[in-house]
Design a protein with these regions (language model features):
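Extended, composition-driven regions rather than compact fold-specific motifs
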Residues: 1-237
């Protein structure tokens, strides 16, 4: 009984905390890729200061009671205060469950929007490397790179249909490549080696599952790229 009462008090305190601090947005559209483990969500965020997104941002979204997940918006438009989330729902968890149940006109609540500290370096070649969970991050990076000819990269994707849809949906120099290993780092380093990037003038931006990001960083260093030319952002274990 005592434990149950304490739990109720914590939930009540948490609800008060959330009601004071949370901001809200509205779902404009939800698109489920086939198979529906990739979910594309268009949002209107009237309170977001989108015109000052000079580094790749992340949104700390409320996905359940006192439960939050960080998602990277892409395709943002400061005039309309809109953006799109790309959520990899292939694994179980509160974020995936939340995304799968979203519908048009639902209200989305979020705690804050902050920077990932990823912004394009002033170098001739910006290379983005990621997986399904970092699709939004890679597309956001592409959006920020000017001129666009400086940008290239690859996203490792397990599902063949998703790779085909990516090529259809986006005008992007990002290549969707087949996942031939569990975490994806071996597939990505093989792709990098085939591109023969310039050792001195290439900066890599890595984002995705922690194992892939960590191992890919090691493999790039073995290829001769220094730490100063490798920027990392790990999302999940």
């Amino acid at each position: 009984m005592e434990t149950s009462t304490l739990h109720k008090l914590k939930r009540k305190a948490g609800s008060l905390f959330e009601s004071q601090l949370l901001q809200s947005g509205r779902v404009l559209e939800v698109r489920h890729w086939e198979p529906s483990t990739m979910i594309e969500i268009d949002l209107h965020l009237p309170q977001a200061d989108i015109q000052n997104w000079h580094e790749i941002p992340y949104i700390k979204v409320r996905v359940d009671d006192l439960t939050y997940r960080d998602y990277t918006p892409a395709g943002w438009d400061a005039e309309t205060n809109t953006c799109t989330l790309y959520i990899d729902a292939a694994h179980s968890g509160p974020g995936s469950k939340w995304a799968k149940h979203l519908q048009k006109d639902d209200i989305v609540r979020y705690l804050k929007i902050r920077s990932t500290r990823h912004a394009p370096a002033s170098t001739p070649a910006i290379i983005g490397l990621g997986d399904e969970s970092s699709m939004g991050h890679m597309l956001a990076l592409q959006q920020m790179v000017l001129p666009a000819t400086r940008f290239s990269g690859a996203i490792v994707m397990a599902d063949e249909n998703h790779r085909g849809l990516f090529g259809q949906y986006f005008k992007s120099p990002l290549m969707p490549i087949e996942r031939n290993d569990v975490y994806g780092h071996h597939s990505l380093i093989q792709w990098v080696m085939e591109q023969q990037y310039n050792l001195e003038h290439s900066v890599f931006y890595l984002a995705g599952n922690h194992t892939m990001v960590g191992e890919l960083r090691k493999l790039l260093k073995l290829q001769g790229y220094p730490s100063s030319q490798i920027r990392v952002q790990g999302f999940w274990s």
